[in-house]
A protein has these predicted regions:
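Amphipathic alpha-helical polymerization modules
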Residues: 1-139
């Protein structure tokens, strides 16, 4: 994910004016990464075979240690998937069990709602900062 450019060459007072815009834009970028990861998890909640082999494993998006950079990373949840006895399934092992993903759709839905609300809050902050800048320019 590309990081949001900062304004290092601009004079300090100008950078301060754009600070709220930059901060909320970074927040929106981080939340978008969370939303994308959650959507991928939900879409693969029943995927028993991946190109790498085995069932899909839930991914978790994490914000970097310094949220000001807007950097995120995605890690794989190592929790094993649930085993279901289904000897007729093409992905069943020798004992007739199929490993299903470790994705709980209800947990993903709650995470999705939370990420969406935080994203909306960042959009509101961005709009408010933009409105204040326009008023300042009109003065």
């Amino acid at each position: 994910m590309a990081s949001i450019p900062s304004f290092p060459l601009w004079p300090r007072p100008v950078r301060r004016l754009f600070g709220p815009l930059e901060t909320s834009a970074r927040g929106m970028g981080i939340q978008q990464r969370f939303l994308d990861t959650i959507a991928t998890n939900i879409a693969n909640a029943q995927t028993t075979r991946t190109p790498e082999g085995g069932a899909y494993h839930r991914q978790v998006a994490l914000a970097g240690a310094d949220p000001a950079t807007g950097e995120t990373m995605t890690v794989v949840d190592p929790t094993p998937g649930r085993m279901v006895y289904d000897p007729g399934h093409p992905d069943a092992n020798a004992d007739g069990f199929v490993e299903y993903p470790n994705v709980d759709v209800s947990v993903e839905t709650v995470d999705l709602m939370m990420a969406r609300r935080v994203h909306e809050a960042n959009v509101s902050v961005f709009q408010a900062a933009k409105s204040m800048l326009r008023r300042a320019i009109d003065l």
